[in-house]
Amino acid sequence: MTEIKKLIVLTSGGDAPGMNAAIRAVVRTALHYQFEVYGATAGFAGLVNGQVVPLNSRAVANCIQRGGTILKTGRFENFRFKAVRDKAREFLKKLQIDAMIVLGGNGSFAGASKLYQEGGPQMIGIPCTIDNDIQGTDYCIGFDTACNTALQAIDKIRDTAFSHERNFLIEVMGRSSGFIAVNVGIAGGAEIIALPEFHVDIDTLTQKIKKQHGKKSASIIVAAEANQPGHSFEVAKQIKEKTGIEYRVCVLGHTQRGGTPTVKDRVLASLMGAQAIEALKKGLTEKMIAYQNGKIAVAPLPDPDNGTRYFADEALLRVNNIICAM
């Protein structure tokens, strides 16, 4: 087991509220154990381009309440090429980096894992995505904040929907999973929740709309983006053509990725960040800090080819149908 003296932390992929709380915990826990800590800016691109900054306790002060990431982030597609990873590995070797902590999702973990297998430093992943769709953990940093941001928007839209007696189709993020949609749909009292995991064809959807039409002065559909951002405009168009009922479309978009992290995201991010350092001290590598059954745990990395988690509790949709049908 290699003794860790120098550590690097980076954020990769899409940003998520709570990342800064995790960075802060990583840095200060590492400093507690006398590690020398660095941060790579703009994700894996920072390792290739030599964009690295030393991090001390003051560098992460006053960031726990901030959304986004102080280290910047991004997707770096070229990291899939070995020649590019070799350049990153040589740079880390030159800096004498012993371990790396990656905040991100499946693709980010896979990149760091390959780097380790090719002679790079020990690595631990911390799951950060508002989509909450990483296999092996019940919770990902950023999800709670994103849900609260979306819910605030839905509550405001419902105010105007009621005032004008209008119907709205609200599209939320989530990529190919429906965790955001089902949570904010139930919390926002949506009459219909549309998820990619339980696909409903347009004819079934319009029949449901016609059955509900007239019972209320306004109606809200919450739909997951289902890997097709903006698809709700076409859905609303088909609803109008088949039923004559108009639905105004509101795509919440990237507003869900920003904002001050909630208590839940700050606390879990802090605990996960600290646990990542403890895992490295035990000599662990190619692991993820997960939230399982209400506890912080160390788990295997998700399968890079099959690491997406999907919403599966159809009973929640049935409950919402009963509550919102009246």
Curated annotation (Swiss-Prot):
One of its GO terms (cellular component) is 6-phosphofructokinase complex. Keywords: Allosteric enzyme, ATP-binding, Cytoplasm, Glycolysis, Kinase, Magnesium, Metal-binding, Nucleotide-binding, Transferase. ATP binds at G14, R75, F76, G105, N106, G107, S108. Its cofactor is Mg(2+). Gene3D superfamilies: 3.40.50.450, Phosphofructokinase domain (3.40.50.460). It comes from the Bacteria. Allosterically activated by ADP and other diphosphonucleosides, and allosterically inhibited by phosphoenolpyruvate. Mg(2+) binds at N106. Homotetramer. This is ATP-dependent 6-phosphofructokinase. It comes from Coxiella burnetii (strain RSA 493 / Nine Mile phase I).
